[in-house]
Amino acid sequence: MIVLGIDPALGSLGWAVVAKESAKLKYLASGVIKTSSKDEIHHRLSYINSILEKVILEYKPNMATIEETFVNTNSVTSLKLGYARGAIMSLIGRYDLDMREFKPNTIKKTVTGYGHAEKDQILHMIKLLLPGTAAITNSDEADAVAIAYTCLVTKNY
């Protein structure tokens, strides 16, 4: 089972690929897709999808999992995040991948044991749980690893 974890965002999206072979988890790759707020939104969404498409074609995941969205007090921010999520879900559908969503607190609790963990705690635990992740310093990237990890350890596939 190969899972693509995505921490959805328009400005700085984290992605990670984690595999489960027998009972062992294996970190394969991760990264961050950054877009500029100066660019038009349709160009930003297209760029995000073009990078994620390359990841899908290279690693051939069986499933994609994304963090559920909470409603932000700023409706414009929520709407833009909704655009990003919709574009990502469309890409996932185009490649006929199964998809799961997890609440942020579920991800935090699975990775750290505490549902209200801070970003640095998630980053620290990911490095302990998955060999190969020591070089990760970006919290969006770490969140994406945590999302994929949550899917695999909760056997939600």
From Swiss-Prot:
Keywords: Cytoplasm, DNA damage, DNA recombination, DNA repair, DNA-binding, Endonuclease, Hydrolase, Magnesium, Metal-binding, Nuclease. Its EC number is 3.1.21.10. It comes from the Bacteria. The keyword Metal-binding applies. It comes from Rickettsia bellii (strain OSU 85-389). The keyword Nuclease applies. Belongs to the RuvC family. This is Crossover junction endodeoxyribonuclease RuvC.
